[in-house]
Amino acid sequence: MDILTNTISLLFRPRQKEIARFAQDADAIQHKQLKSLLSTARNTEWGLKYDYKSIQGYADFCERIPLQTYDDIKPYVTRMINGERNILWPSVVRWYAKSSGTTNDKSKFLPVTPEILKGCHYKGGFDTVSIYLQNNPDSHFFASKGLILGGSHSPSPLNRNAHCGDLSAVLLQNLNPLVNLIRVPDKKIILMDEWESKIKAIVESTWKTDVNSLSGVPSWMLVLIKAVLQKTGSEYLTDVWPNMEVFFHGGISFEPYRDQYKALIPSDRMHYMETYNASEGFFGLQNNPEEHSLLLMIDYSVFYEFIPINEVGEEHPTVLPLEAVEVGKNYAMVITTSGGLWRYQIGDTVRFTSLYPHKFVISGRTKNFINAFGEELMVDNADKAISRVCRQTGAKVKEYTAAPLFMLDKAKGRHQWMIEFEKMPPSLDDFASLLDKTLQQLNSDYEAKRYKEISLQPLEIRVAREGTFYEWLRRKGKLGGQHKIPRLSNDRTFIEELGKICDS
């Protein structure tokens, strides 16, 4: 560890000790978060509506405040964007994280209060570096620059003083100036709206810089890496940036991309660290490089609740606090935060791998799964299966999506996968057969429905021509940033749209 990194790393040690206490004090820490959130918001319009002052504990909170979706809170958020204060949260909120919308809206605008910005998102970034340095005492992290690949922001159409953009852009815009000393590219470049021009500008401004860390979404960072290699004529990223040591990634599963990164960055010193930083808050980070699970961050002014996946959408689902969850079960996450979200259903599903400390994997989205035949196929099943089959066959998958395909009588059907390959497998039939068998190994419900083909026929694969998924994102105005391909869908909307592009 160089002198600068060693000196700065001393500042992280007190926080490392606090995180270690998560294993013993999780329940008390969580209830402290709830008490503080209720106290802070007791005089807001929302707090007065539900009489926060009289809430004595979790039982009262759970009984009094209904579960919320974006459609439920949208009228309040709109008023906040228009300059009203003391609505969902006491402070005036000038920044909003823009994310993919609901059935009724093209986009969601989620409040980014000063409190959640500092006490959740930036705290998560601080802790990520802290844990990374703790796990890698030979790091030279602060001796070189970090490249952050973010989105863009633009003034909200609702109010001149309210700004919106994808989360990464909001975070970059409000970043401590000291952090900018160790970050590239220039803020003006990273916040460019037009994706393809941005990639060119990033490459031109950074390829001669000493970069040792990357931060971003795996799929989009891969585009940038290939652009850097094309610019320099290099085979490996370490030829361009020899001090490269870590990629902080999130937004989508890293599994389908892991082998491609290892091929382009063939270094024993290269590390990969996953974070869970959503528009609604920073929720988890990978604290053990030997495990793919994430540590739930329980002291970020976020109170967590969980709905068993089979009860999502019910009028009165079971809702559990953190102390009541079980290992191995899929839950939809519900959050209460210093961003003014109260019992808010974010749409992500998680599965706990350990308790005390609470570790989990992101298993998917409440809307991104296939359960047309009772198979309950989740995104993490699909990602793992694709990754395993690629290793077995030597194939490389660039993007994929899957949806049910019903037979004429609708009593039977199959899953149709559309896959864009970076490298085709020797035999597509063998790839499909292996994928089908691997899904059965990973998911007992899928295996049961495939038994003797009673309700589910063998899956089929349609090969997408090069650029199909990129073009779909371009037409949707979703190039770059935190935009992602829907991996699984219970209907055929996405796959039909992709099919039309593929046929054109």
Language-model segments: what does each one mean?
Residues M1-K53, F61-Q68, Y76-G83, S168-S504:
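Active-site glycine/GP-rich loop and adjacent strand/helix microenvironment
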Residues L37, Q56-G57, T69, P114-H121:
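Accessory carbohydrate-recognition regions in carbohydrate-active enzymes
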Residues I131-P177:
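Conserved AMP-binding loop of ANL adenylate-forming enzymes
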Residues L110-P111, N159, K226:
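Short, solvent-exposed loop/turn and secondary-structure capping segments
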Residues Y96-L110, I461:
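Conserved adenylation A10 loop of the ANL superfamily
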Residues V112-Q134:
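Conserved structural elements of the adenylate-forming
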Residues I81-K98:
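Conserved pre-ATP/AMP-binding loop-to-beta segment of ANL
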